[in-house]
């Protein structure tokens, strides 16, 4: 009975000592948090291992993250993963669709994004671009003649239109002189002519009798205007003038209209400020609706794919610029010892318990061996 009691005692003591020793060793990894002194003498094993080596631990964790966890190869592989790309494209499409189907005005959206004075700046920028383009255009074309400046198709159209212009002018002239206003104007012209000739009017009056001069002249003028020869004559005159104009410099326009006036007239006609204001007052949905399908089906997938491709090709450079090791080191260095202990224990709690139990088991087994040795020695 004493033998079995001795074995039980040695086994129990061995288990208690083994379990307690392992438990104490685990605790000493974290405790005490600060060094303990007796006078000027620092008690050995204080502070605990992790508090004592926290800075080194932070450095090593940073290296471990960069060299073994967040490696360029691993991240690049993830970025080129087909399933990951599909998921990211779908997410991007959902988020972009929320924006482009928004019923708020474009002006309101820009203000919400803190983009101030966009209307004024856009108007000024557009007017500046238009002004620069017009001035550049005029500077170039002012070095040309009209023949050089106008396209060949315009030359053909003008030359083909001259006979029609002649016919139109003569038609309007006939219509004018057939009217009472035209007859009155013709009469005044005749009176002015004879007034400058003195007695010539009396001499003409003797030949015409009671018929007024204008009644005689009006039909002849209309007849003259309606003749083919008159049309041909006017056409030739217009063609000669057109030939003269083609040889003249475009720059001569500046003697009649200055550059600034041309620019100002075009800007007034374009109404940039009004156009920009109307555009900004439209809802985002109205602006984007014509291109919504293109954005969703082509632009977003293409942008995401190209972005991921670029990221995969430059991931090493990106990680180097991020200095992840330093970030991890700085973050770990800011952890309190208590937080670091809680973090490690939250991950390894079950394993550390098993180590304690293993110590008790080994201690118990050693106790049994000791009991057996004592038994044989007796």
Curated annotation (Swiss-Prot):
It is found in: Cell membrane. The chain crosses the membrane at residues 1-21, 357-377. Its main location: membrane. GO terms for cellular component: plasma membrane. It holds the Pfam family DUF445. It is a multi-pass membrane protein. The keyword Cell membrane applies. Keywords: Cell membrane, Membrane, Transmembrane, Transmembrane helix. Disulfide bonds: none annotated. It comes from the Bacteria. Signal peptide: none annotated. Belongs to the UPF0754 family. This is UPF0754 membrane protein BCQ_0944. It comes from Bacillus cereus (strain Q1).
């Amino acid at each position: 009975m004493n033998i079995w009691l001795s074995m039980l005692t040695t086994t129990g003591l061995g288990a208690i000592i083994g379990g307690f020793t392992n438990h104490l060793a685990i605790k000493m990894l974290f405790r005490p948090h600060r060094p303990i002194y007796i006078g000027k003498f620092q008690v050995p094993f204080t502070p605990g291992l992790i508090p004592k080596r926290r800075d080194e631990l932070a450095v090593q964790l940073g290296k471990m993250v960069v060299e073994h966890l967040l490696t360029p190869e691993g991240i690049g592989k993830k970025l080129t993963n087909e399933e990951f790309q599909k998921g990211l494209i779908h997410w991007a499409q959902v988020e972009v669709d929320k924006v482009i189907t928004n019923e708020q005005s474009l002006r309101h959206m820009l203000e919400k994004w803190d983009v101030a004075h966009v209307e004024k700046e856009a108007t000024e920028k557009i007017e500046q671009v238009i002004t620069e383009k017009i001035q550049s255009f005029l500077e170039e074309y002012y070095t040309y003649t009209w023949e050089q400046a106008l396209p060949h198709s315009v030359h053909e159209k003008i030359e083909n239109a001259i006979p029609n212009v002649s016919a139109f002018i003569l038609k309007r002239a006939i219509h004018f002189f057939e009217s009472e206003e035209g007859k009155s104007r013709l009469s005044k012209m005749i009176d002015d002519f004879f007034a400058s000739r003195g007695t010539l009017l009396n001499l003409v009056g003797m030949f015409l009798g009671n018929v007024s001069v204008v009644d005689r002249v009006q039909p002849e003028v209309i007849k003259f205007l309606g003749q083919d020869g008159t049309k041909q004559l006017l056409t030739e005159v217009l063609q000669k003038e057109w030939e003269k104009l083609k040889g003249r410099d475009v720059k001569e326009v500046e003697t009649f209209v200055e550059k600034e006036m041309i620019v100002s007239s075009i800007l007034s006609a374009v109404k940039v400020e009004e156009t920009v204001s109307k555009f900004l007052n439209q809802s985002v949905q109205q602006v984007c609706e014509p291109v919504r399908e293109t954005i969703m089906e082509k632009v977003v997938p293409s942008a995401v794919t190209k972005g991921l491709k670029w990221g995969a090709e430059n991931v090493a450079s990106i990680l180097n610029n991020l200095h992840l090791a330093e970030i991890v080191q700085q973050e770990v260095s800011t952890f309190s010892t208590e937080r670091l202990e809680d973090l490690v224990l939250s991950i390894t709690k079950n394993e550390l318990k098993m180590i304690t139990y293993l110590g008790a088991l080994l201690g118990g087994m050693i106790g049994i061996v000791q009991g057996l040795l004592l038994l044989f020695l007796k």
